[in-house]
C-alpha cells in the first residue's frame, strides 16, 4: 500500500524541537513516537491500539529491551500497569519510542519543553499522567539503542549529571503547577538525589 509520509528538514534544535515539529504536522487521531536509533517490533502498534477501544485510556506505553515491571508499578487485573504522577516521581517508565497517545493529549497538555534537553520526556509524561489516563503494557515492544543498558553508555542518557538536573527541574515544575504539595515536593527532591548518588555508584562499578 502507498504510505503517506512527509519528510521535514530543519536545523538541529534538540530532540524536543524535532518531536514538536512532527507533532504539529501530524494529522491523525493517534500519535506514535520513534527515535532514530530505536526499533519497533512488527506488531507493536496493533497490540497497543487494542487498548484504546475501551474509550477511557488516553496514552499507552510498553516495555523495551530487558525492562521489567518493578515497584511502585504492578500489573492490575486488566493485564496492564496504571501509570500515575506519583509513581512517575518514584520511577520514570515509558520510553519515548514506546508511546502511542490520542491527539487530544496535545490539545490538553501542549508540547515538549524545547528549553529542556534532559528528562524532557519524563516532564511531559508527568503532566499527562496528572489528568489523563496513562497505562503501560507488560510487553516488550521496542528495542532502544541497539539493546544497550540505559546507564553508562554513550548518548544523552549517559550524561548523568545533566539528567539529574532535568529530574530536579521536573519536580520543581510539578510543584509550580500545583500537582504536588510541599511535603511531596521535599520528599521527591531528596529521593531524586538519592537515586542520582546510586547511579553514580553503579557507573563507577561498571567501569
Predicted features and spans:
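Glycine-rich, basic loop-to-helix element that forms the pyrophosphate-binding segment
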Residues: 10-26, 47
Amino acid at each position: 500500500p502507498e504510505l503517506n509520509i512527509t519528510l521535514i528538514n530543519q536545523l538541529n534544535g534538540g530532540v524536543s524541537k524535532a518531536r514538536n515539529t512532527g507533532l504539529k504536522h501530524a494529522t491523525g487521531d493517534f500519535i506514535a513516537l520513534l527515535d532514530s536509533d530505536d526499533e519497533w517490533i512488527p506488531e507493536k502498534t496493533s497490540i497497543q491500539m487494542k487498548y484504546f477501544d475501551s474509550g477511557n485510556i488516553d496514552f499507552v506505553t510498553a516495555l523495551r529491551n530487558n525492562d521489567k515491571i518493578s515497584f511502585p508499578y504492578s500489573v492490575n487485573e486488566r493485564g496492564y500497569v496504571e501509570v500515575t504522577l506519583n509513581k512517575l516521581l518514584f520511577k520514570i517508565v515509558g520510553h519515548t519510542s514506546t508511546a502511542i497517545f490520542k491527539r487530544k493529549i496535545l490539545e490538553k497538555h501542549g508540547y515538549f519543553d524545547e528549553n529542556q534537553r534532559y528528562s524532557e520526556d519524563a516532564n511531559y509524561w508527568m503532566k499527562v499522567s496528572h489528568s489523563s489516563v496513562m497505562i503501560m503494557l507488560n510487553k516488550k515492544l521496542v528495542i532502544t539503542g541497539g539493546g544497550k543498558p540505559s546507564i553508562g553508555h554513550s548518548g544523552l542518557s549517559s550524561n548523568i549529571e545533566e539528567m539529574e538536573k532535568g529530574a530536579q527541574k521536573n519536580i520543581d515544575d510539578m510543584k509550580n503547577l500545583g500537582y504536588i504539595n510541599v511535603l511531596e515536593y521535599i520528599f521527591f527532591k531528596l529521593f531524586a538525589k538519592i537515586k542520582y548518588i546510586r547511579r553514580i555508584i553503579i557507573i563507577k562499578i561498571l567501569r
